[in-house]
C-alpha cells in the first residue's frame, strides 16, 4: 500500500481542507516520507495557497513511496465534513486510483474518492520585503472581515508603531477596527515604517473561514504589496495564503 495516514480529530482536518477549497477547485497533493504538501493558485490568480503538514502532526504516518495525487477539493470537503469532531481520520491509497477516507468513532465509515489528473504548476512562494508583521487572534480578524463586508468590497490594513487598524469605506458609511498591544486581540506587532495596503474582502472572507477563534494568525504586508497570512496546525503544520493587493487609483 503506497500510504496510510492517521489524523486524530477529523473536524480539524476538515476545516483545513474547507478553507483551501473555498479558493481552488482541484489540487495536487504531494505525499512524501516527510509529510503532505500542496501549493496552488486560485483560478483568478489572485491568491496563492501553500499547505505543509509534516509527518509529526499525524498519529500514524506510513508512506511506501513518494506520490502526487490529484483531488477534487469540493468532493473532498464534502466527505470530510461527514467526520465528527473526535473521529479518527484515516487516509489510505493502494494501487488503485482512488483515496480511501475512513472515519472511526461510534462506527467505522469509509468513503472512496476517485483521484483526478491535475496539472502541476511550478509555483514559488516568494520572500517579499514586508515592512509590517502583525499577530492577532483569529476571532478578531474574522469579525473585522465581516464588519468590513457590510461597507465595501475592499479593506485597508494599516500598521504603525504599536498600532494596527483595518478600515473599509463605502459611499455612505465606513468602519474602522483599531488594535493596540493593550488589546487582547493583538498579540504582537513589528513595523519598520508606517505601512498601508488594501485587499479584496471576498478573498479575505474565504481565507479566514477555517480559522478558529482562538487561533493565532500572522499577517505580513508592505505598502501596496501582497499580504501573507499564516496560521499553524498543531504548531508544526502551516497553511499560508499570499493575496495580491487591491491597488487604489
UniProtKB/Swiss-Prot annotation:
Set out the biological process GO terms recorded for this chain's protein.
leading strand elongation; regulation of DNA replication
Q: Name one GO molecular function term.
A: DNA binding
Q: Which PROSITE patterns does the UniProt entry name for this protein? A: PCNA_1
Q: Which Pfam families does its entry note?
A: PCNA_C, PCNA_N
Indicate yes or no for the key word NADP.
Answer: no
Q: Cystine bridges: which residues?
A: none
Which keywords are on file for this protein?
Answer: DNA replication, DNA-binding
Keyword DNA-binding appears in the UniProt entry = yes
UniProt lists the family membership as follows: Belongs to the PCNA family.
Functional description taken from the UniProt entry: Sliding clamp subunit that acts as a moving platform for DNA processing. Responsible for tethering the catalytic subunit of DNA polymerase and other proteins to DNA during high-speed replication.
Record PANTHER family: PROLIFERATING CELL NUCLEAR ANTIGEN
What is its quaternary makeup?
A: Homotrimer. The subunits circularize to form a toroid; DNA passes through its center. Replication factor C (RFC) is required to load the toroid on the DNA.
Name of the protein in question:
DNA polymerase sliding clamp
What species was this sequence derived from? Answer: Thermococcus fumicolans
Its gene name is: pcn
